[in-house]
Regions:
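Phosphate-binding P-loop
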Residues: 15-21, 194-195, 244-250, 282-287
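Conserved hydrophobic alpha-helix in the ABC-type ATPase nucleotide-binding domain
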Residues: 215, 270-275
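P-loop NTPase switch/coupling surface
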Residues: 1-168, 174, 285-289, 303, ...
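Conserved H-loop
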Residues: 254, 270, 290-295, 298-304
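Extended helical coiled-coil dimerization/tether regions that scaffold
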Residues: 92, 129-249, 386
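Walker B catalytic acidic pair
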Residues: 257-259
Length: 387
């Protein structure tokens, strides 16, 4: 299994060795390092993907002139102060390892012995917390200026790659608002309101729709890419045209920041279920594991995943389909409990495993501290009122 270990990067003190599962949930307070962890992991996955589909020169490039760490800082817009001589990144991937010691050294990148025979092509997608800018800011794709390719510009380019697919005849119904469909017309984003037959630019949609719509569109289209031909240059096509493992996408990897943004609790539930269902679809189509990394502050997101985990646990224990539980457990749409992982980032920058292996459930205690405060203060006020 793929693992990553990060020390002394931004607020992260020592993550320990964290395994990348099909669904990996990261919980923590503001500025605790959730995005830092996910961005470092995404960068390592991207470098591995690049090496799997490109020629030998890519590995050599990332191993010299500090390219690995400098491209990490630039692309993900890290403050240079996040890194120091004590920083450490150890990535043990599918077919390569990356080790970065300090901030002023070259990364050591090593290919595993079976690299040549087993390398494959995958599709990566980082959906940042700033995703609603494509809806909230008019003509952002023309007004956003970056001297170098960074995470936001890359997101805009990826959005341009997928949005044209959803025409008026191929609109996408949103899970967070079933009466709303998204489509693109002449490069402009619209939503169609089925209850009154009206359309309006996404610019005028609610903040919840503006935040969820990019996630729903990206996961729908990117999961559909699995098994299809990859978009490669003519040079790369000549190299991989006879190798379907590299010519076709074998999996998709999502990195999604705070999917709950601006959403009502029930809509959070619908979005998470949609995300997981698309993950299941991608894993059925691909020859390699597709995965999703989520960061969250939301107890509702944790609760929804716990329902899925409890259903998965039942299916694990009762693998033979039972019609009597059809209204409770969906055997066709469940992911075994072993494919869920969840961690909490403590105040000291270390990781804590939140999965109870016996139940299994994700502990939500760290997210629900406000309930104790509410209960304590209401109790005190009630004593004053009622004696």
């Amino acid at each position: 299994m793929v693992t990553i270990h990060i020390k002394n990067v931004g607020p992260l003190k020592d993550t320990g060795e964290i395994a990348l599962n099909r669904l990996l949930l990261i919980i923590g307070k503001q500025s605790s390092g959730k995005s830092t962890f996910m961005k470092v992991l995404c960068h390592c996955r991207w470098v591995e993907k690049t090496l799997m589909v490109d020629d030998d020169s890519s590995a050599k490039d990332y191993s010299k002139e500090h390219l690995f760490i400098e491209s990490l800082k630039t692309f993900h817009r890290f403050n240079p102060d996040f890194f120091s001589s004590d920083s450490y990144i150890k990535y043990d991937g599918d077919y390569i390892t990356i080790e970065q010691n300090g901030d002023d050294t070259d990364a050591v990148i090593t290919r595993k012995s079976d690299f040549e025979d087993r390398r494959y092509n995958t599709k990566l997608c980082f959906i940042p917390s700033e995703r609603n800018l494509i809806s909230a800011v008019k003509n952002l794709d023309r007004t956003y200026k970056a001297t170098e390719l960074d995470i936001l510009l890359n997101y805009l380019l990826e959005w341009d790659e997928v949005k044209d697919y959803y025409s008026t005849k191929n609109a996408l119904r949103l899970s967070v608002a079933r009466n709303i469909q998204y489509y693109n017309d002449g490069g402009a984003d619209f939503i169609y309101l089925s209850q009154n037959g009206k359309k309006l630019p996404v610019f005028y949609a609610s903040s919840g729709v503006q935040s969820a719509m990019p996630i729903e569109v990206m996961i729908d289209r990117y999961c559909a890419f699995v098994g299809e031909k990859a978009s490669l240059s003519k040079h790369d096509w000549k190299q991989v045209s006879n190798d379907t493992s590299k010519a076709n996408y074998q999996s998709v990897q999502f990195f999604i920041e705070e999917p709950e943004q601006n959403l009502y609790p029930m809509s959070q539930k619908d979005l998470i279920l949609n995300i997981v269902n698309h993950l299941l679809m991608a894993n059925k189509k691909g020859q390699k594991d597709s995965s999703i990394v989520l960061t969250t502050h939301s107890p509702y997101v944790v609760s929804v995943l716990n329902v899925l985990l409890s259903q998965a646990r039942y299916c694990d224990l009762h693998p033979i389909y039972d019609v009597n539980v059809d209204d409770i457990v969906d055997y066709d749409h469940y992911m075994p409990s072993k494919y869920y992982s969840a961690y909490y980032i403590n105040d000291n920058g270390t990781f804590e495993n939140l999965i109870d292996s016996e139940l299994p459930m994700i502990s939500g205690v760290e997210l629900d501290g406000v309930s104790d405060w509410v209960e304590e203060n209401i109790s005190k006020v009630n004593e004053l009122i009622y004696g």
